């Protein structure tokens, strides 16, 4: 199937989800815009300056269709305010029947890189999570197009709810997270020219989302580092610290 047909199929699925959802009550819509001092993806410094990342999603009974983009605001890798990446995703998430403590997700992502020389690519993913102490989770991504390799992320997190509140629907939380990821030789060879599987990157993050009804404002900071020596040598900026603020609205 050609890339254009895949893109049309993904867009059709997202729109179909939205059309179906509008006729039902079990529906969620969301829009968001994040502003960060860098764009770091899986430990890779993609844009080393301020970016804006708008997104939109529609959900229906566990299914979610979403569109996410990255805008280079200062012309680091493309012209000012142009998009250098647009992602289209379909996700299904739920709990395991009879085991409400454990959840799972599965989906598809189409990565497009407008205004760049990079070819688009596609991934399937699947994940498991547990509603236990530190919320352990694992997520496997398989790039079956350009990289033909896997990226497996192990994560933990903790949320301190309502560290401050100003009424029933006005409060703020403290959200902490950490992850480490392993990538196979195919993935590392494509992205770094390293023909070995390795633990690639580790990330820690902290955020303080302020919730005002359906509106959330979330300042956050994060730090990531490349772990494997060969991968570190292949990346220009192996250690990254960044921060920013996200705005989201659900209805």
At which residue positions do the language-model features occur?
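Cleavable N-terminal export/targeting peptides
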Residues: 1-28
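Short loop/turn motifs that connect adjacent beta-strands in outer-membrane beta-barrel proteins
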Residues: 22-28, 95-103, 116-118, 133-135, ...
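Outer-membrane beta-barrel translocator domains and adjoining extracellular loop/strand segments
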Residues: 43-47, 76-83, 116-122, 139-140, ...
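Residues that define the transmembrane beta-barrel architecture of outer-membrane proteins
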Residues: 25-27, 48-52, 82-86, 102, ...
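Short glycine/proline- and aromatic-enriched beta-strand/turn motifs that initiate or cap beta-hairpins
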Residues: 23-74, 90, 181
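Transmembrane beta-strand segments that form the barrel wall of outer-membrane beta-barrel proteins
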Residues: 33-39, 63-73, 102-114, 124, ...
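Residues on the lipid-exposed face of transmembrane beta-strands in outer-membrane beta-barrel proteins
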Residues: 33-35, 54-60, 88-94, 108, ...
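Detector for outer-membrane/organellar transmembrane beta-barrel domains
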Residues: 121-195, 223
């Amino acid at each position: 199937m050609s890339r254009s047909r895949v893109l049309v199929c993904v867009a059709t699925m997202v729109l179909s989800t939205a059309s179906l959802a509008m006729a039902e009550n079990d529906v969620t819509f969301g829009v968001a815009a994040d502003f960060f001092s860098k764009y770091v993806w899986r430990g890779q410094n993609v844009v080393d300056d301020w970016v804006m990342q708008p997104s939109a999603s529609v959900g229906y009974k566990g299914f979610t269709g979403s569109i996410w983009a990255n805008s280079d605001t200062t012309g680091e890798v493309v012209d000012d305010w142009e998009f250098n990446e647009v992602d289209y995703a379909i996700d299904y998430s739920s709990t395991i029947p009879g085991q409400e403590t454990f959840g799972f997700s599965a989906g598809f992502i189409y990565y497009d890189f407008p205004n760049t020389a990079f070819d688009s690519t596609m991934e399937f993913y699947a994940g498991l999570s547990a509603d236990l102490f530190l919320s352990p989770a694992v997520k496997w991504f398989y790039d079956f197009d350009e990289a033909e390799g896997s990226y497996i992320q192990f994560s933990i997190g903790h949320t301190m709810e309502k560290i401050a509140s100003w009424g029933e629907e006005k409060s703020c939380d403290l959200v902490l997270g950490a992850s480490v990821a392993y990538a196979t030789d195919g993935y590392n060879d494509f992205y770094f020219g390293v023909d070995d599987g390795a633990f690639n990157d580790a990330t820690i993050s902290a955020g303080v989302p302020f919730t005002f009804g359906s509106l959330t404002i979330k300042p956050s900071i994060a730090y990531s580092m490349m772990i494997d020596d060969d991968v570190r040598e292949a990346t220009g900026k192996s250690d990254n610290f960044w921060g920013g603020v996200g705005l989201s609205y659900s209805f």
